[in-house]
Amino acid sequence: DVLPEGLTWRIHDGYIRTTTWDAEGESITLGIWGPGDLVTNAHSGLDPVEVQCLTTVVVEQHNPSDAETLAFLLQQIRNTEEIFEINRIRSAERRLLMLLRWIGLRFGQVSSRGYRFSLKDMNLTHRALAEVCGLTRVTVTKNLNRYKTLGLLQQVSEVDLFIPSEGLALAI
């Protein structure tokens, strides 16, 4: 589903991705947003910008104050810069691992031992991960399996994944 254009929404539950397209029609992820975040396409200079629901979401229309708008724009810039930086990593293996780390930092539970998060709860399929970081679905699937074999990614429950800090430090 897509949220209506030009409005600002506060996310209470669920996850949203903002995207645009290049001249060839390839999707470009501008940001991923979750509970507590504001999201809008009203301040973008790009056309089109689509606000896509990754999961079922609970949102409310919000009229942000000037301070909230500034905070939102700064967060949007940070989010886009971080995704851009990840996408500039040449190695597909390292790029996907850094994307998973970013997801863990941004939306997961962070501890001194590592990052715990759920791709399933965010509805980030292998295809969706591939779109975010400019890889193929097959490459994402192969790398996820490889990370699990190497211990860089651990399945800690049916839906939760864990990236241990020490394994990540070795991979970086």
Predicted regions and their residues:
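Polybasic "coupling" helices that flank or enter modular domains
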Residues: 71-132
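Cyclic-nucleotide recognition modules
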Residues: 29-83
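Regulatory nucleotide-sensing modules
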Residues: 1-13
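Surface loops and adjacent helix of pleckstrin homology
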Residues: 21-23, 44, 62-64, 158, ...
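Phosphate-/nucleic-acid-contacting segments
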Residues: 108-172
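Short beta-strand segments in beta-sandwich/barrel cores
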Residues: 14-20, 38
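Short, acidic, Ser/Thr-enriched surface-loop or helix-capping motifs
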Residues: 11, 22, 148
